[in-house]
UniProtKB/Swiss-Prot annotation:
Keyword Ribosomal protein part of the UniProt annotation: yes
Organism in which the protein naturally occurs: Pseudomonas syringae pv. tomato (strain ATCC BAA-871 / DC3000)
Organism phylogeny: Bacteria, Pseudomonadati, Pseudomonadota, Gammaproteobacteria, Pseudomonadales
Official protein name in the record: Large ribosomal subunit protein uL29
Domain of life: Bacteria
Gene3D superfamilies associated with the record: 1.10.287.310
């Protein structure tokens, strides 16, 4: 996901996406804890996506 794509979305859409990403992160952490996570790069990828969404939300709030 690109930051430019996120900037085109509304705050409500971004909040919904953020909740989905947080759920994904939780599920991936549980899979890692139980040894079922085969693609460990997904954890850091989701973490970065969360940071991107939060950054865009803060930028929109500052305007």
């Amino acid at each position: 996901m690109k930051a430019n794509e996120l900037r085109e979305k509304s705050a409500q859409q971004l909040n919904e996406q953020l909740l989905g990403l947080l759920r994904d992160q939780f599920n991936l952490r549980m899979q890692k804890a139980t040894g079922q996570l085969g693609q460990s790069h997904l954890l850091s990828q989701v973490k970065r996506d969360i940071a991107r969404v939060k950054t865009v939300l803060n930028q929109q709030a500052g305007k």
